[in-house]
């Protein structure tokens, strides 16, 4: 695997970083976070102009490395725009499985005019499970869905949903549902993101593409989303570490900077080690997808390291900042909240370990 970014990918990173750095500081983030939407339509339009909202829609290009680059920069600035969950992940499903009519949605998504959301998670669901209790029923070639989806990230603002449901003949199907047809209850997550619960009561739905069992396509989308979360977490960890080291260099105690105390610098060094472990696993997971390998074991390894590194860096960043680290006006607590939320999205540490333990039986025994 070649872990070097191309010139185009470096340019995409630099343009995204410049746009977000120019837009977001802690005051702006707090102000935007208090709005009903929770993110900026103006920034969304800027991301569309850059070409970010259509990454990966081309069937000849995975776009996974570009997705990783963009999500890392979003994580670095704590940008609340739902690039992955309201555009790239559900849009990628439509690009892969949708029919010609449904693919017309992709131009609107890429231009920032339409928001999609993947409604797959259900109460009690853990990790990358594709088992759902929402039922799909067909009568006279018309499909209806019944069930509950929660949490649906960006479900509060989506114009259309890609909904997973159990098929009568077995397997899991994917359906396009208009937002006006569902009963949704928006809520705010503890890290300031937006989500919703969808109550589906015989809601009219259109099969995505030719219909039938879409389990494989759904699994690929979930693995892509997990990789995107890993990339976002790496960006957040990078900035949390930078803020912490800057604080240690500037804050004085007993007449000298805190960075002069060896114990504190060693703790910062341990944070750096955790960051590099997370970065390498995130890159590895993205590269595997870019090469066509949607391996849940690779995804679990990456997410496990992200969970561990994120928890370590978030906790140490707050501890090394002292009391200011938990104030709302200072950014480090918000980075800790986002890293904690990412650690629980699409599977916690325990869920990743469960996946890895379950895969052990496939390696066989070693004879000496």
Locations of regions flagged by a protein language model:
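Alpha-helical interface subdomain recognition
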Residues: 1-78, 97, 112, 138, ...
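Short Ser/Thr-interspersed hydrophobic loop/turn segments at strand-loop and sheet-helix junctions
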Residues: 51, 71-74, 177-181, 203
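A short, Trp-centered hydrophobic/proline-enriched beta-strand micro-motif
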Residues: 112-123
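A generic structural signal for well-ordered coil/turn residues at beta-strand boundaries
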Residues: 112-114, 130-132, 157-159, 171, ...
